[in-house]
Swiss-Prot record:
SUPFAM superfamilies: Frataxin/Nqo15-like. It comes from Verminephrobacter eiseniae (strain EF01-2). Belongs to the frataxin family. The gene is cyaY. GO terms for molecular function: ferric iron binding. GO terms for biological process: iron-sulfur cluster assembly. This is Iron-sulfur cluster assembly protein CyaY.
Amino acid sequence: MTDLEFMDHAEKLLLAVERSCDRINETTDADLDSQRSGGMLTLVFPNRSQIVINLQKPLHEVWMAARSGGYHYRFDGHAWQDSKGAGEFFACLGRDATVQSGRPLQFAA
């Protein structure tokens, strides 16, 4: 994958997370805050815990840091998969956001 292809896929991922946060806030009282700064997106929960998602352009990876740990995702042509087998990005984000918020939250591409 070229740098340009990576950035295209990675930007789509960040935009999808931002849109999911907007949808969650419109349909629930989760009060999720998303803050974007370049290639980094920080999700802040009412209990002040955070999930940080950032782009690692040289490695063609998207990294996610949550209370449960750190994860590295690579695009396999269809989805972003964890490099150590933890699963697909949006499923993992939903799992960690649910734990950190104390309520069921779903994210989608």
